[in-house]
């Protein structure tokens, strides 16, 4: 069998634009609603707005007494003002709702309690002193998160605090990695610590790719090793694109070698968008689609495989 050459090599920028521009990435993943408590690490499918303000009431920011500020005007060390508890002022703890008719808090450290019913102050308080007003943190209807936003743990708290109990998120991408090659030995078939025979190598690339994809937030599965047999690889690709995978990565089989079938199969089953990218390592990358599903022919050399994955699958 003759070897092919790369006739239409693309620059990295061209390849990225062609491949990513071939699909409407905003609609590739369907929307689903999930409990906000489970939303960390997910991507919003729509803007998220606060259902109510935080806090929802005027609350004390300090332990002390709540009162109407104007009752304290004129207070000074030489002219203290006495206040009747339960009449002029009311004990409050941090976070407690202000009693009706009050708009200020004086810290307990600034009070002189004369008896169980009377306190004395020597300085005036201003309106809303040591008070967390309604909406200080979040205002009802405020935009909390934009669309296409990766939700952090802190933002889960903000949404829950603002009454958002469900959130619309994008479906988690599902990726299948298919390792290929007659020379590959599955780790499950190794005999203890005995090295594989000459001409055979332990297949590990796919596990590196699988765990990278999971680290990036995808649900990723690994196909069993497919030998250098076009019909078996054809069936593996067809089964994947007809299932529920959003991306298929074929590892190895993308170069111009006589046993590298990936590009031919993608062209036969769908369309090759790019074959060959002007990067080293990573040159043999094949980018295409089958049944409207992105299929990436990932180089077999380990460093090339990772670089290709980072450039074309991670986005």
How would you label these PLM feature ranges?
Residues 133-250:
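Phosphate-binding glycine-rich loops and their immediate beta-loop-alpha structural context
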Residues 93, 122, 146, 177-180, ...:
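Short beta-strand segments
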Residues 96, 181-183, 254, 302:
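Glycine-rich beta-alpha junction loops
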Residues 104-112, 192, 265-272:
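A glycine- and small-aliphatic-rich helix-loop capping segment at beta-alpha/alpha-beta transitions
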Residues 2-167:
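Phosphate-interaction motifs
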Residues 100-101, 153-154, 186-187, 255-260, ...:
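Short glycine/serine/threonine-rich phosphate/pyrophosphate-binding segments
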Residues 208, 216-315:
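Short glycine/threonine-rich loop/turn motifs
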């Amino acid at each position: 069998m003759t070897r092919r050459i790369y006739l239409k090599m693309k620059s990295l920028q061209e390849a990225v634009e062609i491949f990513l521009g071939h699909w409407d990435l905003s609609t590739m993943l369907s929307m689903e609603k999930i409990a906000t408590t489970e939303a960390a690490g997910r991507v919003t499918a729509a803007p998220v707005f606060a259902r109510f303000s935080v806090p929802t009431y005027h609350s004390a920011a300090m332990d002390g007494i709540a009162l109407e500020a104007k009752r304290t005007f004129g207070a000074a060390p030489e002219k203290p003002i006495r206040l009747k508890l339960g009449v002029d002022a009311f004990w409050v703890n941090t976070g407690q709702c202000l009693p009706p008719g009050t708009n200020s808090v004086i810290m307990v450290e600034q009070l002189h309690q004369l008896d169980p019913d009377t306190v004395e102050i020597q300085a005036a308080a201003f309106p809303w002193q040591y008070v967390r007003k309604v909406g200080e943190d979040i205002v009802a209807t405020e935009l909390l998160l934009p669309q296409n936003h990766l939700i952090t743990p802190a933002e889960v708290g903000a949404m829950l605090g603002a009454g958002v109990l469900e959130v619309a998120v994008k479906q988690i991408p599902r990726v299948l990695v298919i390792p290929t090659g007659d020379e590959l030995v599955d780790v499950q078939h190794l005999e203890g610590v005995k090295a594989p025979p000459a001409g055979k190598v332990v297949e590990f690339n796919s596990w590196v790719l699988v765990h990278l994809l999971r680290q990036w937030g995808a649900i990723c599965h690994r196909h069993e090793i497919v030998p250098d047999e076009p019909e078996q690889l054809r069936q593996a690709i067809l089964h994947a694109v007809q299932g529920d995978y959003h991306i298929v990565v074929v590892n190895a089989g993308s170069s111009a070698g006589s046993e590298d079938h990936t590009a031919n199969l993608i062209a036969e089953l769908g369309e090759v968008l790019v074959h060959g990218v002007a990067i080293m390592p990573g040159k043999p990358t094949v980018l295409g689609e089958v049944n409207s599903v992105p299929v990436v022919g990932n180089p077999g050399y380990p460093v090339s495989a990772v670089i290709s994955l980072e450039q074309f699958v991670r986005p």
